[in-house]
Amino acid sequence: MSDSVQKYSASRMGSAPIGPLLLSCSVPMMISMLVQALYNIVDSIFVSHVNEAALSAVSLAFPIQNLMIAFAVGTAVGVNAYLSRCLGEGNRAEASRAAMNGLFLAFCGGIAFLVFGILGARAFIASQTTDAQIMQYGADYLSICTLWCMGLFLQCMLEKLLVSTGRSAFAMASQLIGALVNIALDPIFIFGLFGMPRMEAAGAAVATVAGQWIGAAAGLTMNLLCNKDINLTLKGFRPAGSTIKRIYAVGIPSIAMNAIGSVMTFAMNNILIAFSSTAVAVFGVYFKLQSFAFMPIFGINNGMVPIIGYNYGARQPKRITQTIKLAVCFAECIMLCGLILAEVFPQVLLGVFNASPTMLAMGILALRIIAIHFPMAGFNVISSSAFQALGRGTLALSVSVIRQLIVLVPAAWLLSRTGNVNAVWFAFPIAELVAVTLCAVFMRKCHRDILLPMEAGQKTAAAV
């Protein structure tokens, strides 16, 4: 690729109209994340046709899966934000250094969870249930997901390298490849088709890690062949402490926010298992279904963060403000659609998961109550990503800690004391109401402390 084409690829972040730019960066990732949500749901749909115990087991394994995603995506988000800022400042050498250090960190994360899989997977499942069948399903599933998790870490990092340089379509393609492989392999391994052994819950895990590894291979190929804004080479590479520090200035708050989600789901599983394993299954199904609403918003985030990062480096505050406002509008439209579906068609949504009459009776009301928080969550998700892109990841972390640990879990526990499982679901809208208030306050703070001084600097420079 010529230098002029490379400059155009980066400079459009600072000059193209915000609406078309945000859509061009976000829509491919929205599509790929919808497919990601689809194959997560397909996993659970197939597992639910084994039996409800298998579905409950997968739900109990979710906190560790979410923790792996927290480290993989959080580190990649840090690389995304820092790399985009380097390109905005015209520092391509440091951008390439950020990319290579990001891949090094992804490798380290994969090794860490591999060790956990060997030593702690079975103990983690046993800490949540005494049911022998659920314990066996959960241990089999989680062991495979952790032992082969390197594919997840590399796939997330390689996708974010493509997104951070404005090549969202390639990132979408790599994720689609992995997702389609997962979907195709799920029934084969779970039910033992085409001569394969019937693996049940373990088969879902095998299909998942196979899709992640193939998606990572596709992402690496696309970066090497098509991503000329960065240079991926092991020649002369050494981990750079200063670069890693800048990556984790954004990455650690992002990791912490998602890791808090693992703590929250672990706590909720333990609150709900006191009622029944069906309550845990309902909670697990909700998390699969809500990804259809949240994944497109995460796609908007993936398109928004490099635009904000570039324009932050290029000192263009008006474009930053326009990007955030437009992203919030898109997010609210998506969340309103999710709210309508959950309120009008809960029985249809649960029926897809082979729900028993008991699960339907509990799940219909659960979906309708929890979905109340969707519109508030749209604003909160966009705001938190904007804080990270502006180098204020601690604000996003504060919102996440308060929402999930200080409000949601204690509220759920207190409501569970009523002895009515339906009361527990109200903890979600209560926590989101607190979070939306905090996000509004912090957004005003960022505008006052970051964007207004930037605008004043532009006016001073223009006057001179």
What residue spans do the PLM features occupy?
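Structural signal for membrane-spanning alpha-helices in multi-pass inner-membrane proteins
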Residues: G117, K160, D186, I190, ...
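Small-residue-rich hydrophobic transmembrane alpha-helices
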Residues: L55-V115, L152-A171, F266-N269, V282-I340, ...
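Short alpha-helical transmembrane segments in multi-pass integral membrane proteins
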Residues: M1-S26, L83-M150, M196-I252, I308-H373, ...
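Transmembrane helical elements of multi-pass membrane transporters/channels
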Residues: L23-D43, I144, G178, G211-G215, ...
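Hydrophobic transmembrane alpha-helices of multi-pass small-molecule transporters
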Residues: L67-A70, N182-P187, A216-L220, F292-M295, ...
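Helix-terminus/linker motif at the lipid-water interface of multi-pass membrane proteins
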Residues: L34, L38-S56, I125-A132, I188-M199, ...
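Short runs within selected transmembrane alpha-helices of multi-pass transporters and secretion channels
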Residues: A76, N80, C145-V163, A171-A179, ...
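N-terminal transmembrane alpha-helices
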Residues: M13-I45, H49-V50, P63-G78, Y82, ...
